[in-house]
Amino acid sequence: MTNSLLTIGDMVQGVELPDADRQFWWDSLAPILSRMLQCSKYSVESQANILSFFKDFIVPSYGPRPSIGGEFFWKSYVTYNHTPGQVSFNFHKDKCTVRLSNVPTAPLAGTASDPFNQKGVVQTIKQIQKALPDMDITLFDYFSEAFLVADEDTVGLDARKPVPQYNQLVVASMLGYDFEPVPRVKVYFNPRWKALQMNTENHDLIWTAINNLGSPIKSYKRTLDLLQECGTPRQLGGWIFQPEFISFDLAENMSNAARLKLYGFTTKTCWSHIESIYTLDGRLNDAETQRGLAVLKRLWHLALSIPEDHDENQDLPPCPHLTAGVIYNYELRENSAKPEAKIYIPVRFYGSGDGKVIEGLVDFFKSEGWDELARSYQRDFVSVFSTPDGKMAGEHHDISFSYKNEHPYVTAYYRPELIRPMERHIV
């Protein structure tokens, strides 16, 4: 990463969009995205192409802007305060990739026409196909059919929700973008509304849909069998895995390694439980898994400012937020004998603030020999998220960790702070 930034005016200022909603999202997020791309040493041509893609296809998907008082049009807990997306840096050795995710929101979300905000993702994918015509949407079509509630079946379903906050807790769909530099699109589905409609368990619905894929899933069979085995505890009261939601890539050719990820969630935050998640409760005990576990433990302690003598069987101090806990996933790749575990360290819920998170990350980067990143990270964080009036327009939300090919992959996820609406955002 580097701090030799172009001026924001070179890329984003003066851009006029056709309506106040799009203008608000562009003015809020484009400066941050532009600075992230510059910090990550993307070429000027790549920056321009990515910002153009962002303007034409991602910005419209954010939907209606917040109210003048700051209330979001569609509230979802993809971040702790309903901000409908995140931006992130992915670090692997000396390479840094910029990523972005958001909850596509259609203008009729929350009405009888789209009570659970399902139409936004379908509309957005159709638009993106215009820019990426080689993108294979076979998996998208299959899983949207399996996981989204048909219009005629939505009637009366809202009245059956188990808790009042269900609409915010269940993020029915989300899109992610890896800028490599050509955008790689990832789809997330949480089928809880569909499971409610069908009177079945969410994890059973996910397993059924995956197993019914047929021939495309055969090359994942060994890994899938292992994960499904984890639905039964190895000992009384032991850890089990029940997928909460899934994600998959929309690759150019589905048979050419469209990664499939299964996500879990736990409110247990003691290290011994995290170790069980990472090793599938001891089912994975190979040398690479053990090396990755040791590196993860170091990052876990540094990012959360946990003393080395903290009891490994004791949960972290409780956080009252409704969504506080640990998200994790298992990535499936073709013909792989084991899944790749990823842990999302919840620094917003259990950390000690951005200053301590930065300090912990810098110490971790040093321990991995990522010297340039250790020198530049704090400076670049300030460069990306500082505003002209000296305030910060972003904060760390999660830090994810995975380990493959003998190297860690670390991603820092940030919640962007949106701007206050200006005159041109009010119509």
Swiss-Prot record:
The keyword Transmembrane does not apply. The keyword Glycoprotein does not apply. Indole diterpene prenyltransferase; part of the gene cluster that mediates the biosynthesis of the indole diterpenes penitrems. The geranylgeranyl diphosphate (GGPP) synthase ptmG catalyzes the first step in penitrem biosynthesis via conversion of farnesyl pyrophosphate and isopentyl pyrophosphate into geranylgeranyl pyrophosphate (GGPP). Condensation of indole-3-glycerol phosphate with GGPP by the prenyl transferase ptmC then forms 3-geranylgeranylindole (3-GGI). Transmembrane segments: none annotated. Pathway: Secondary metabolite biosynthesis. L-tryptophan binds at Y77, V78. It is an enzyme of class 2 (transferase). Keywords: Transferase. The gene is ptmD. GO terms for biological process: alkaloid metabolic process. Signal peptide: none annotated. Its EC number is 2.5.1.-. This is Indole diterpene prenyltransferase ptmD.
